[in-house]
Amino acid sequence: NVGKSTLMNHLIGQKIAITSKKPQTTRNRIQTVYTCEKGQIVFLDTPGIHKAKNKLGEYMVAVAERTLKEVDAIMWLVEPSTFIGAGERHIAEQLQGVGVPVILIINKIDTVKKEEILPAIDTYRKICDFAEIIPCSALRGQNTEDIIDSILKYLPYGPMFYDEDTVTDQPQRQIVRSEERRVGKE
């Protein structure tokens, strides 16, 4: 669990996406909207790309892979590690030919020593050509404004898709149901 939903919730300032310590908590694509004076960002929080072990896993990976073709920029969230496994290499290969800027977000920097962050950046830089690499802590809000500024640089100019009060395409009932499901499992 690299903290995609935690980051989305922090960036828009509301708890929309379910967060959990378990990986693959996000099962469907969740759209959230961030609006500021500089522009509007529509985030698509997808299930993580992983090696599927069953039909649900295959569905979740397909949702994530389809989304790669619909966006103006991609944020790839990882943890601060110098170990690159087969899963990360697979994702890096998929991202090489997408034709849009890929921003690497190294999340959870609050869980490692500062000296460990640069080696993690160097490790990831070797496997993919990133437009930018931003270390952050979604939980603590460290460097999250840098993420917003970075994304805004890559978005095309045009009208806003949503009014400034919209934060998600999820109906309130779905958000409550998701929260009830999460609370019921803890």
Located regions from the model:
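Conserved G1/Walker A P-loop phosphate-binding module
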Residues: 1-62, 66-68
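Conserved small/polar residues in nucleotide/adenosyl-binding loops
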Residues: 180-186
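Amphipathic alpha-helical repeat scaffolds
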Residues: 1, 9, 105-107, 184
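Conserved C-terminal guanine-recognition region of P-loop GTPase G domains, centered on the G4
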Residues: 38, 62-131
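Conserved nucleotide-binding/hydrolysis micro-motifs of P-loop NTPases
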Residues: 23-25, 47-50, 80-84, 109-112, ...
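Solvent-exposed, charged helical/coil patches
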Residues: 164-178
